[in-house]
A protein has these predicted regions:
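Single conserved hydrophobic/aromatic residue that forms the stacking wall/gate
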Residues: 1-7, 11, 435-443
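Soluble non-transmembrane domains of integral membrane proteins
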Residues: 5-8, 12-198
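Helix-loop-helix
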Residues: 58-59, 70-84, 88, 159-434, ...
Length: 443
């Protein structure tokens, strides 16, 4: 192993000669060569495409009378870990797919412990939020990968089987290097055209991969139609509402009935306040009689959660969303609303600290949540009612730092929900007002 490393250092640290063309372009590759003391010639033919791909074809010409073994290898070095915010939904660090298994190692993990794996196929690299540098070893060659830290972060591979080159024999090996911005179409194109196993996972789609990726393609489709990602987000919100319209319709009808039944429920609670068991029985009888599901009102919230996180993920990790403007003051949908209610949205010449940046769109979102809440039945428990009343303000503060595109999605979704809910309540109220609610049996 030591002798092998010495040979590697000998090859790597030599001065190479450029043969012929000395300018690397997509139409003109370059050739580097070097001959060692044993009369073995090493040639590197380096070519690039018109985007991010480098191909390094390494040829060894053995002009000696002996047989030698060589171990092709490649290495990516990062001197320092970047300054990153520790988001739980995004991986930045060392990455690879080995025999179809994704491996993600954070910088701090590698500082503490080396990672090694043997594989028959795959790729390895170092990734940031929007950028990746990756190595793709030659196909059908087994290799070992090491992620380690020795004053520098290193992602490297070395073939585990020697390439034997006899006297007067020539052999070649090709390594692909991709130094890319993580644009979805480009990454997918390399994965398909170069047959790179699961290279699309270079973009951190996350746990909701099955939902996030199709959602991105749909948003991107609407963007190509409208020319604005903000409008695309609004259209995707409408599509989601349409898909789940029947389920939301059922839920809102049940909530509307609950609101109409609220006086009767209050009366029952007052009547049976000393007998919890009897109260429960009477309540269940009332629900059964009027065909009301008391928990169905939670369905719209549960429906929103996966799509909320999926859109957040799309906004957060896809390069296509970066620096995409909406209308007015929103210049980047992947960033928070830059305005603040505490300086009257820019009318007062004062820059509030970041935790006070509660902008126009978060305020609109909070207002839409408050108005939607007014359409729901009031909780009979006073403490619960106060908590619910405080909830829109709480979420406004919590979601204010989130990407403005996500806040726009939430606001439009609330408005559409209110419209649907309002119509259903109006229709259901008239219908239920004709229902006679029988008196409960008194004890």
């Amino acid at each position: 192993t030591t002798a092998r490393r010495q040979r590697q250092m000998c090859i790597r640290d030599r001065i190479w000669t450029i043969e012929g063309n000395n300018k690397l372009t997509p139409n003109s590759p370059i050739k580097l060569s070097w001959t060692n003391d044993q009369n073995i010639k090493f040639i590197k033919d380096i070519s690039i495409d018109d985007q991010y791909l480098f191909k390094v074809n390494q040829t060894i010409i053995n002009n000696s009378e002996k047989t030698y073994n060589f171990y092709p290898y490649g290495q990516i070095i990062r001197n320092l870990a970047p300054e990153i915010i520790d988001f739980f939904i995004l991986h930045e660090g060392l990455i690879g797919v080995f025999d179809d298994q994704l491996v993600e190692e954070d910088y701090d993990d590698i500082e503490e412990k080396k990672f090694s794996i043997n594989a028959d196929k795959g790729w390895l690299g170092i990734t940031d939020k929007y950028w990746i540098t990756s190595l793709i070893p030659q196909e059908n060659r087994k290799f070992r990968t090491d992620f380690d830290y020795k004053n520098k972060f290193r992602a490297n591979f070395i073939e585990t089987s020697a390439t034997e080159i006899g006297a007067n024999e020539t052999k070649s090996n090709e390594i692909k290097i991709i130094i890319a911005a993580k644009e979805v179409d480009i990454i997918a194109g390399y994965a398909e055209n170069l047959n790179i196993s699961k290279y699309d996972l270079a973009i951190d789609w996350g746990w909701f991969y099955f939902l996030v990726k199709p959602l991105f393609f749909l948003i991107d489709y609407f963007f190509k139609l409208t020319g604005n990602f903000g409008i695309a987000i609004i259209l995707i919100t409408i599509c989601i509402r349409i898909v789940f319209f029947p389920l939301a319709n059922y839920s809102f009808k049940s909530m509307a009935k609950m609101k109409v039944l609220q006086p009767e429920m209050t009366r029952l609670k007052e009547l049976h306040k000393e007998d919890k068991m009897k109260l429960q029985q009477e309540m269940m009888a009332l629900y059964k009689k009027e065909k009301v599901n008391p928990v169905s009102g939670c369905l719209p919230i549960f429906i929103q959660i996966p799509f909320f996180f999926a859109i957040y993920k799309v906004l957060f990790v896809t390069l296509e969303m970066r620096h995409q403007p909406f209308y007015g003051w929103i210049k980047d949908l992947s960033e928070r609303d830059p305005t603040s209610i505490f300086n009257l949205f820019g009318l007062i010449p004062w820059d509030p600290p970041s935790f006070l940046l509660i902008g126009v769109w978060p305020c609109l979102m909070g207002l839409s949540m408050y108005l939607q809440q007014k359409l729901n039945p009031t909780p009979p428990d006073p403490i619960q009612a106060k908590i619910f009343a405080f909830f829109p303000l709480f979420l406004t503060v919590i979601l204010a730092p989130f990407p403005s595109g996500l806040v726009i999605y939430w606001t439009i979704n609330d408005i559409l929900t209110m419209a649907q809910q309002y119509v259903i309540i109006k229709r259901t109220t008239v219908k239920l007002s004709l229902i006679h609610i029988s008196e409960p049996t008194r004890l």
